Amino acid sequence: MRKKIFAFLLLSALYAGAQEAPDWENPIVVGINKEPYHATLTLPSQKVDCKEIISLNGKWRFQWSADPGKRPADFYKNDFNTDTWDTITVPGAWQLQGYGKPIYSNVNYPFQKDAPRVTSEPPAEYYSYGHRNPTGSYVTTFEVTPDMKDKCLYLHFEGVKSAMYVWVNGERVGYSQNSMSPAEFDITEFVKNGTNRLAVEVYRWSD
């Protein structure tokens, strides 16, 4: 009986520890409120001419942080002022626009290998020693017109490296990680007529 109780308590402790991990260090979580993957039915050459596709490419407000603890945690709120922030081109890698450091490694991990954690303390010579998990906070706006009423609206990201949270008008829509595949979210219930605020928080590394 004592062994069974001990085993139960041990499993409970492990489960509680897993629950405390952020989504981007939790191997159980790879997406929240994402649409199922599906085939792309619109050819890239036709997207420009499609009236039902609105591109959000362009200049977004942006702030880069060396690690999650230094990010502006409330930036997604509607009353958060980003007027003093820089602007960044989307799509685009922030490392090629003056933020952080480009790293290419097909052998070594760019962070301390301690799965599923990506923020464990690495050797002092690692770039990630002083930049545990660089985080980008992005904000833009888009318009919803009356003719969109009664239509389902989806937010489509063609690739984000490597994990992100998404908010629309201050409400959290979902989470995704998988930098080499698209991510889609149904934002129909989050939008309103007129100007809408989109906030995206991107983490450079995830489990």
Range-by-range predicted roles:
Residues A115-Y127:
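Short glycine/proline-rich turn/loop motifs
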Residues I28-G31, T42, Q46-K47, R61-S65, ...:
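Accessory beta-strand-rich segments of carbohydrate-active enzymes
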Residues M1-E20:
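Bacterial Sec-dependent N-terminal signal peptides
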